[in-house]
Regions:
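Substrate-binding groove of N-acetylhexosamine-processing glycoside hydrolases
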Residues: 1-264
Protein backbone atom coordinates (compact mmCIF):
# COMPACT_ATOMS: atom_id res chain seq x y z
CA UNK A 1 0.00 0.00 0.00
CA UNK A 2 2.80 2.42 0.86
CA UNK A 3 4.42 1.90 -2.55
CA UNK A 4 1.16 2.27 -4.47
CA UNK A 5 0.17 5.46 -2.66
CA UNK A 6 3.55 7.18 -3.01
CA UNK A 7 3.22 10.72 -4.29
CA UNK A 8 -0.35 11.05 -3.11
CA UNK A 9 -1.85 8.45 -5.43
CA UNK A 10 -5.12 6.82 -4.45
CA UNK A 11 -4.87 3.19 -3.33
CA UNK A 12 -6.90 0.66 -5.25
CA UNK A 13 -7.26 -2.85 -3.73
CA UNK A 14 -5.13 -5.37 -5.60
CA UNK A 15 -5.84 -8.86 -6.89
CA UNK A 16 -3.26 -11.50 -6.01
CA UNK A 17 -2.00 -14.14 -8.41
CA UNK A 18 -0.44 -16.90 -6.28
CA UNK A 19 1.81 -19.51 -7.87
CA UNK A 20 0.46 -22.34 -5.74
CA UNK A 21 -0.21 -25.25 -6.01
CA UNK A 22 1.17 -25.23 -9.56
CA UNK A 23 3.87 -27.84 -10.28
CA UNK A 24 5.33 -26.45 -13.50
CA UNK A 25 8.71 -26.23 -11.77
CA UNK A 26 8.43 -29.61 -10.05
CA UNK A 27 6.47 -31.65 -12.52
CA UNK A 28 6.92 -35.09 -10.93
CA UNK A 29 5.10 -34.09 -7.74
CA UNK A 30 1.71 -33.16 -6.38
CA UNK A 31 1.38 -30.26 -3.94
CA UNK A 32 -1.39 -30.97 -1.44
CA UNK A 33 -0.64 -28.44 1.27
CA UNK A 34 1.38 -25.40 2.21
CA UNK A 35 -1.28 -22.74 1.79
CA UNK A 36 -0.35 -21.16 5.11
CA UNK A 37 2.89 -19.98 3.47
CA UNK A 38 1.00 -18.07 0.76
CA UNK A 39 -2.31 -17.06 2.34
CA UNK A 40 -0.95 -15.29 5.39
CA UNK A 41 -2.93 -14.79 8.60
CA UNK A 42 -4.08 -11.39 9.83
CA UNK A 43 -3.99 -9.59 6.48
CA UNK A 44 -6.14 -6.45 6.16
CA UNK A 45 -8.88 -7.65 3.74
CA UNK A 46 -9.64 -4.10 2.62
CA UNK A 47 -6.32 -4.08 0.76
CA UNK A 48 -7.40 -6.95 -1.53
CA UNK A 49 -9.96 -7.23 -4.28
CA UNK A 50 -9.41 -10.90 -5.04
CA UNK A 51 -7.17 -13.96 -4.98
CA UNK A 52 -6.41 -16.24 -7.91
CA UNK A 53 -4.47 -19.49 -7.54
CA UNK A 54 -2.31 -21.05 -10.23
CA UNK A 55 -3.40 -24.71 -10.09
CA UNK A 56 -1.67 -27.95 -10.94
CA UNK A 57 -2.23 -29.61 -14.29
CA UNK A 58 -4.28 -32.16 -12.35
CA UNK A 59 -7.62 -30.48 -11.64
CA UNK A 60 -8.93 -32.86 -8.98
CA UNK A 61 -6.03 -32.67 -6.48
CA UNK A 62 -5.90 -28.90 -7.08
CA UNK A 63 -9.21 -28.76 -5.21
CA UNK A 64 -7.32 -29.15 -1.91
CA UNK A 65 -5.78 -25.71 -2.44
CA UNK A 66 -9.01 -24.26 -3.81
CA UNK A 67 -10.83 -25.29 -0.63
CA UNK A 68 -8.24 -23.46 1.47
CA UNK A 69 -8.50 -20.34 -0.68
CA UNK A 70 -12.30 -20.36 -0.47
CA UNK A 71 -12.17 -20.69 3.31
CA UNK A 72 -9.57 -17.90 3.53
CA UNK A 73 -11.71 -15.57 1.43
CA UNK A 74 -14.77 -16.30 3.57
CA UNK A 75 -13.14 -16.22 6.99
CA UNK A 76 -9.46 -15.40 7.18
CA UNK A 77 -7.49 -17.60 9.54
CA UNK A 78 -5.63 -16.14 12.47
CA UNK A 79 -2.62 -18.47 12.54
CA UNK A 80 -0.67 -20.96 10.45
CA UNK A 81 -1.92 -23.73 12.72
CA UNK A 82 -5.51 -22.83 11.88
CA UNK A 83 -4.61 -22.84 8.19
CA UNK A 84 -3.20 -26.36 8.47
CA UNK A 85 -6.42 -27.55 10.10
CA UNK A 86 -8.37 -26.10 7.17
CA UNK A 87 -6.08 -28.00 4.79
CA UNK A 88 -6.83 -31.20 6.71
CA UNK A 89 -10.58 -30.64 6.38
CA UNK A 90 -10.13 -30.04 2.64
CA UNK A 91 -9.36 -33.74 2.12
CA UNK A 92 -12.72 -34.62 3.66
CA UNK A 93 -14.71 -32.13 1.59
CA UNK A 94 -12.97 -32.92 -1.68
CA UNK A 95 -13.47 -36.65 -1.11
CA UNK A 96 -17.09 -36.77 0.11
CA UNK A 97 -18.51 -33.25 0.09
CA UNK A 98 -18.63 -33.35 3.90
CA UNK A 99 -16.44 -31.83 6.59
CA UNK A 100 -16.14 -35.04 8.62
CA UNK A 101 -13.59 -37.83 8.19
CA UNK A 102 -14.23 -40.85 6.03
CA UNK A 103 -12.03 -43.90 5.63
CA UNK A 104 -10.83 -42.78 2.22
CA UNK A 105 -10.37 -39.11 3.12
CA UNK A 106 -8.19 -40.11 6.09
CA UNK A 107 -6.11 -42.30 3.76
CA UNK A 108 -5.81 -39.50 1.21
CA UNK A 109 -4.78 -37.02 3.92
CA UNK A 110 -2.14 -39.45 5.21
CA UNK A 111 -0.62 -39.63 1.74
CA UNK A 112 -0.95 -35.86 1.36
CA UNK A 113 1.42 -35.33 4.29
CA UNK A 114 4.18 -36.51 1.96
CA UNK A 115 3.13 -34.57 -1.15
CA UNK A 116 3.74 -30.90 -0.34
CA UNK A 117 7.36 -29.95 -1.00
CA UNK A 118 8.33 -28.44 -4.36
CA UNK A 119 11.88 -29.85 -4.25
CA UNK A 120 13.32 -26.62 -5.62
CA UNK A 121 15.93 -23.98 -4.93
CA UNK A 122 15.69 -20.69 -3.09
CA UNK A 123 13.63 -19.00 -5.79
CA UNK A 124 10.40 -20.40 -4.37
CA UNK A 125 8.76 -20.69 -0.98
CA UNK A 126 9.97 -23.84 0.76
CA UNK A 127 7.10 -26.13 1.68
CA UNK A 128 7.76 -28.78 4.32
CA UNK A 129 6.38 -32.31 4.04
CA UNK A 130 6.72 -35.51 6.10
CA UNK A 131 6.99 -33.28 9.17
CA UNK A 132 6.27 -36.05 11.69
CA UNK A 133 8.12 -38.81 9.85
CA UNK A 134 11.32 -36.93 8.98
CA UNK A 135 12.86 -36.97 12.50
CA UNK A 136 12.27 -40.72 12.73
CA UNK A 137 14.02 -41.29 9.41
CA UNK A 138 16.96 -39.16 10.47
CA UNK A 139 17.30 -40.88 13.85
CA UNK A 140 17.32 -44.34 12.28
CA UNK A 141 19.92 -43.42 9.67
CA UNK A 142 22.17 -41.72 12.19
CA UNK A 143 22.19 -44.69 14.55
CA UNK A 144 22.57 -47.20 11.71
CA UNK A 145 25.64 -45.44 10.32
CA UNK A 146 27.09 -45.25 13.84
CA UNK A 147 26.73 -49.00 14.23
CA UNK A 148 24.20 -48.69 17.05
CA UNK A 149 21.20 -50.90 17.77
CA UNK A 150 18.27 -49.71 15.64
CA UNK A 151 15.78 -52.49 16.34
CA UNK A 152 13.24 -50.21 18.06
CA UNK A 153 13.54 -47.54 15.39
CA UNK A 154 13.26 -50.16 12.64
CA UNK A 155 10.01 -51.50 14.08
CA UNK A 156 8.61 -47.99 14.29
CA UNK A 157 9.50 -47.29 10.67
CA UNK A 158 8.00 -50.60 9.54
CA UNK A 159 4.71 -49.47 11.05
CA UNK A 160 4.96 -46.05 9.39
CA UNK A 161 5.68 -47.51 5.97
CA UNK A 162 2.94 -50.13 6.35
CA UNK A 163 0.47 -47.34 7.20
CA UNK A 164 1.39 -45.42 4.06
CA UNK A 165 1.16 -48.51 1.88
CA UNK A 166 -2.25 -49.36 3.32
CA UNK A 167 -3.45 -45.80 2.71
CA UNK A 168 -2.36 -45.95 -0.93
CA UNK A 169 -3.95 -49.36 -1.45
CA UNK A 170 -7.21 -48.27 0.18
CA UNK A 171 -7.46 -45.10 -1.87
CA UNK A 172 -6.57 -46.94 -5.06
CA UNK A 173 -9.40 -49.39 -4.38
CA UNK A 174 -12.09 -47.12 -2.94
CA UNK A 175 -11.21 -43.44 -3.34
CA UNK A 176 -13.15 -40.89 -5.34
CA UNK A 177 -13.20 -42.10 -8.93
CA UNK A 178 -12.28 -38.79 -10.57
CA UNK A 179 -9.44 -38.22 -8.11
CA UNK A 180 -8.08 -41.73 -8.58
CA UNK A 181 -8.05 -41.28 -12.33
CA UNK A 182 -5.61 -38.38 -11.94
CA UNK A 183 -3.41 -39.55 -9.05
CA UNK A 184 -3.13 -43.35 -9.43
CA UNK A 185 0.45 -42.88 -10.62
CA UNK A 186 1.43 -41.55 -7.20
CA UNK A 187 -0.52 -44.29 -5.44
CA UNK A 188 1.39 -46.96 -7.34
CA UNK A 189 4.66 -45.17 -6.68
CA UNK A 190 3.87 -45.02 -2.97
CA UNK A 191 3.08 -48.74 -2.76
CA UNK A 192 6.31 -49.74 -4.49
CA UNK A 193 8.43 -47.34 -2.45
CA UNK A 194 6.99 -48.69 0.80
CA UNK A 195 7.69 -52.26 -0.33
CA UNK A 196 11.23 -51.28 -1.28
CA UNK A 197 11.74 -49.66 2.11
CA UNK A 198 10.46 -52.76 3.86
CA UNK A 199 12.98 -54.87 1.97
CA UNK A 200 15.82 -52.46 2.76
CA UNK A 201 14.86 -52.54 6.45
CA UNK A 202 15.14 -56.33 6.25
CA UNK A 203 18.59 -55.79 4.82
CA UNK A 204 19.59 -53.53 7.70
CA UNK A 205 18.55 -56.29 10.09
CA UNK A 206 20.62 -58.79 8.13
CA UNK A 207 23.67 -56.55 8.59
CA UNK A 208 23.25 -56.70 12.35
CA UNK A 209 22.92 -60.48 12.23
CA UNK A 210 25.83 -60.97 9.80
CA UNK A 211 23.45 -62.76 7.44
CA UNK A 212 25.01 -62.11 4.04
CA UNK A 213 22.51 -64.22 2.11
CA UNK A 214 19.52 -62.35 3.52
CA UNK A 215 21.32 -59.06 3.03
CA UNK A 216 21.80 -59.75 -0.67
CA UNK A 217 18.22 -60.98 -1.15
CA UNK A 218 16.78 -57.95 0.66
CA UNK A 219 19.00 -55.52 -1.21
CA UNK A 220 18.14 -57.00 -4.60
CA UNK A 221 14.42 -57.13 -3.82
CA UNK A 222 14.39 -53.52 -2.63
CA UNK A 223 16.40 -52.37 -5.62
CA UNK A 224 13.96 -53.92 -8.09
CA UNK A 225 10.96 -52.50 -6.24
CA UNK A 226 12.48 -49.02 -6.25
CA UNK A 227 13.21 -49.32 -9.96
CA UNK A 228 9.59 -50.35 -10.49
CA UNK A 229 8.42 -47.32 -8.49
CA UNK A 230 10.07 -45.12 -11.10
CA UNK A 231 8.00 -46.50 -13.98
CA UNK A 232 4.68 -44.73 -13.36
CA UNK A 233 4.64 -42.04 -15.99
CA UNK A 234 1.95 -39.54 -16.90
CA UNK A 235 1.55 -37.01 -19.67
CA UNK A 236 2.56 -33.49 -18.67
CA UNK A 237 1.30 -31.23 -21.47
CA UNK A 238 3.56 -32.60 -24.22
CA UNK A 239 5.92 -35.10 -22.57
CA UNK A 240 6.02 -37.84 -19.95
CA UNK A 241 7.01 -37.35 -16.30
CA UNK A 242 7.57 -39.91 -13.51
CA UNK A 243 5.31 -39.67 -10.47
CA UNK A 244 7.13 -39.39 -7.13
CA UNK A 245 5.85 -39.28 -3.56
CA UNK A 246 7.92 -38.20 -0.58
CA UNK A 247 10.56 -36.29 -2.51
CA UNK A 248 11.81 -34.26 0.45
CA UNK A 249 12.51 -36.98 3.02
CA UNK A 250 11.21 -40.44 2.06
CA UNK A 251 13.01 -40.83 -1.25
CA UNK A 252 16.37 -39.49 0.08
CA UNK A 253 16.07 -41.89 3.03
CA UNK A 254 15.37 -44.78 0.67
CA UNK A 255 18.36 -43.93 -1.50
CA UNK A 256 20.58 -43.47 1.54
CA UNK A 257 19.56 -46.83 2.96
CA UNK A 258 20.16 -48.42 -0.42
CA UNK A 259 23.72 -47.11 -0.39
CA UNK A 260 24.34 -48.39 3.13
CA UNK A 261 23.29 -51.87 2.05
CA UNK A 262 25.29 -51.63 -1.18
CA UNK A 263 28.51 -50.90 0.70
CA UNK A 264 28.00 -54.03 2.81
Amino acid sequence: KNNLTAGGKTYRPVSLWINWPVTDNSKQHLILGGGEKFLHPNVDPSLLSGIMLNPMQQSEPSKIALFSAAQYAWKQWKSEEEAKKVNDIAFNFVETGKFTDSETSVAFRELGKHMINQNMDGRVVKLEESVELAPKLAAFMSKLKAGQDVNAERQELRAEFAKLKAAAQLYKASGDEKMRAQIHYWLDNAIDQMDALSAFLDGSEAIENNDSARLWDSYYKGLKLYEQSQTYTFLYVDHDERAELGVQHIRPFLLGLREVLATE
